[in-house]
Amino acid sequence: TAHIVNTEGGGLAVFAGAMSRVIDGQKGIFTAAQLDAAVRRARRHTPKPRMVVVEQTSNSAGGSVWPLEAVREVGAAAREKGLITHMDGARLLNAVVATGVSARKFAEPFDTLWLDLSKGLGCPIGAVLAGDKDFIEQAWQWKQRMGGAMRQAGIVAAAGVHALEHHVERMAEDHENARYFGELLGNTPGIMVEDGIETNMVFFNVEGTGLTAEDFRDRLIESDAIRIGANDLYRMRAVTHLDISREGIEWAATAVRNLARFNLPR
């Protein structure tokens, strides 16, 4: 389910010249023992392992949250093997709100961390990359080389500061809205909602409606101007955020139910 493996246009291989080795965890969460088993001794025929990445929360696994103890155990196992550790924390603060565990505690086992400001926090643009002084200096150089310098970025930073100060706790509302949306779709003929809605994402399968996910998405846009992502042939992903109200959840759920019932195979 790893985001850096399944998306980003293969940037890991293109820009870093690196290949990935996927660990088959439970809902995107693997164990220290699985990490130990996956790290192969470097030989002529095998690439040298260098880094382990944890995605918090796990997007394609339904927004699942890594427990703090699992994070610590994987971090310790990685250090024992001399591996660099990175947290893809695009939705880290959703995990913070869901568990009550601080971002600092979740981040402690990692050398570097990525935090997105434009998802649940609601900024129009922006993200934060964190690490030690030497790493950040190198990151700035590579950012410049690859055309990532912005002019001017102060207004983006100001929005990020506001979001971090005012929008974190309110994400609990997004989580509640996601659970509510899942409940509203729960008994819809032709719709199969995935279990375990932990944060702000709801995944559901539309195969029973006779439509593909892309067809279902396009018809929702056409009929009700509602946009829900098509993630796979039949799998769809709905994401709640600060612009989605309880009334909006009910409206969207009604539209999904109506479309599903109208297209059920007869």
Where do the PLM segments sit?
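Conserved PLP-enzyme active-site core in the AAT-like
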Residues: T1-D195, T199-S223, G229-I244, W251-R266
